[in-house]
Amino acid sequence: MDTIQEKYMDNYLKFSGCGCDNFKVERTLNSLLQPLQIDSSDFIKFVTYGGCWINEHCLPSWPYFLDRCSTISEFLSFWCGIVWDTRRTQVHKFKLIKLTQCLFRAYIVVVWVVFPKCRLDFKPKKFLENVWYKYINMPFYKAIVTFMLNLNISIKHPLIQFQSCLPWDLSILRRKNKLFCSTLMPLSVPAPSQRRENENLFVHSDFDDQSHEFALMAALKQQGAMVPCGNPLDAMIKVLCFNSMIQNKYAIIPMDNIEKTENFDLVLKILGYNILSSVFGLPIICKKIKDKIIKNTYSQHIIVCIECGHCLNFGRGKSKNLNFPPTHVFYCRDQKIKQFTICGTSGRIYCSYCGCSQFRKFPMVEANIIRAVIANNAACMAQCASQQFDVVVPCLGMCGSCIFKRVTVQSLLYLTSKIESLCCVKCSGVIYNYA
């Protein structure tokens, strides 16, 4: 009854890589969706993001009915006002099939605009009348997936799907027994002995050239002409990708079989950057505290690793911490003696947990917030009001030090409600007199 041909689609759409513009796409969709009384821009959003892409009070009604109706024919009969007459059954079926064809063709146009590579897999196929009868008697979501599979296009509706779970509950963050190992071949560079000719790098100038030690050293140089240095190009690309993604407001990462690719480490770094933190920002709700902060200057600062979120001001100590479950990728098993290490050659500072050399400096006291810090990076696991853990908060007295407190989530939220909660024993008398 109808043939979906690539030539037909080419006449309607010459998309991105082939010189199309937005006007042609809009004109194509308008011609296909006009019999269905559906706006083209709303349909593009529906195919791409599903039925909940905008506020409910602005949402058009047709996605709601398309989702609630049990079959496509039921939706089209209701939405297009087709009154069923038993004397004209064949005419009504023919009209429903024509409307379904317009709906499916418009769907293909949107798929090609969003994912142009799908056109490479597209295989024109003739659909007989009995096949369209099956489609109109199926739910839309099942029918469109079956229709696209018959055209050799494997998709799910909507094209971009959202997970409603919290970021730290993603399935890819569960620790696996066998993690992916990169198969990229490491590079090799000439050994130091091969880079400088006629120079004795490791021996004195008066060393006997005929000695056994010299012969041993020459043999070692001959066997170790090249030394492995990993893959610096691959490492640089990952660093560039990471920095570019965290500097933009939004970033899209392909998640298909991500655990089996070398991009898994990059995904973990991006998720860790957005999830891991050791800092709580407490809004100041006491006017006396705000007035005191305006009149005084406080020097307490914290240094935080941008990758793993650990605070470098801490060292090893007995503190009650929040933590991820043991099966979580970000579960921290031990506490380092020092949160950072210093390179003996370059003097550069590195995080002891992740090896990152990029840090951020935050003041613990600002005009509207006071920062409380924990000893690890699982601040997001504070999910129950009665959870107990230890935090470090700044002292608002004259000593310029910090206070080590054991709090619950509930008491932490009210920590800035009175000035006495933010002073050490030494400064408590001064704070009390000020209050």
Curated annotation (Swiss-Prot):
One of its GO terms (biological process) is viral process. One of its GO terms (cellular component) is viral tegument. Belongs to the herpesviridae UL49 family. This is Uncharacterized gene 66 protein. It comes from Saimiriine herpesvirus 2 (strain 11).
